[in-house]
């Protein structure tokens, strides 16, 4: 009976001595040390987002977990077992930013538009862990080497959002997101906005009338892109003839087959041009 009592007391003492100490701050991709108390052999288990390992350890010594086992950020559990088990949870945080995923929409925008460009940036460490710790992302919009807009945005739930206007000149707009020494760049093509001050001229031909526009610009002076459609309309009393013509090298031209005194006009989108009156020959 005395022997059984000694064994029971020893088991209680071992139960009281067994303890697991985990790091208060761990970083992805770095080795960690887990402390234990007591003496003798035990079995160690580590359970994490993508890891599950088991090996024998000696109580009272530090258990070193190699960096390869902590590359994925998240919640981990360390378990040490003898005749019973003790466990402790700890969190592995992402490492420093190593890359930015940067999405910008759309890829083509008219000039002079408010809040027409949208961007979203997400930071990842070298192991692909999304970084949730709040940080400041710097956005810059530049065209022809000059900065148009600079904005600093605090991440929320790992995401930094951008809404920005387009510039006034057609051409490539570079949109850059930066976080510390990491950056990503995207290019948005700025094109002319709607035509402005549409004007036409014309002359009689044996088959009707030949009309063309003056060089077409938007209100900021940018040439409208080739392919922009201009609709020419010729009226002679109740008779109406229409021709759609694409802009080529800033000008749209059309041959309209119509007779008599004509009133010719042009329109592109919501923009109306001047009216041209051509007398019958």
Language model segments and positions:
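Bacterial N-terminal signal peptides
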Residues: 2-10
């Amino acid at each position: 009976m005395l022997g059984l009592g000694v064994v029971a007391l020893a088991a209680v003492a071992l139960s009281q001595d067994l303890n697991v100490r985990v790091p208060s701050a761990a970083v992805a991709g770095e080795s960690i040390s887990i402390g234990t108390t007591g003496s003798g052999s035990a079995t160690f288990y580590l359970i994490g987002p993508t890891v599950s390992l088991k090996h024998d350890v000696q109580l009272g010594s530090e258990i070193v977990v190699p960096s390869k086992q902590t590359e994925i950020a998240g919640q981990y559990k360390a378990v040490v077992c003898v005749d019973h088990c003790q466990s402790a949870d700890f969190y592995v945080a992402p490492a420093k930013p190593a890359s930015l995923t940067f999405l910008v929409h759309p890829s083509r925008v008219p000039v002079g538009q408010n809040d027409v460009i949208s961007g979203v940036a997400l930071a990842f460490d070298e192991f692909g862990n999304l970084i949730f710790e709040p940080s400041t992302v710097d956005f810059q919009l530049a065209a022809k080497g000059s900065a148009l807009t600079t904005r600093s945005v605090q991440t929320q739930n790992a995401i930094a959002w951008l809404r920005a206007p387009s510039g006034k000149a057609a051409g490539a707009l570079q949109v850059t997101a930066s976080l510390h020494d990491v950056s990503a760049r995207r290019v948005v093509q700025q094109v002319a906005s709607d035509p402005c001050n549409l004007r036409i001229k014309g002359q009689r031909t044996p088959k009707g009338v030949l009309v063309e526009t003056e060089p077409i610009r938007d209100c900021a002076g940018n040439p409208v892109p080739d392919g922009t459609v201009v609709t020419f309309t010729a009226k002679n009393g109740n008779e109406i003839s229409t021709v759609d013509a694409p802009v080529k090298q800033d000008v749209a031209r059309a041959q309209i087959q119509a007779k008599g005194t004509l009133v010719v006009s042009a329109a592109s989108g919501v923009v109306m041009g001047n009216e041209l009156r051509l007398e019958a020959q």
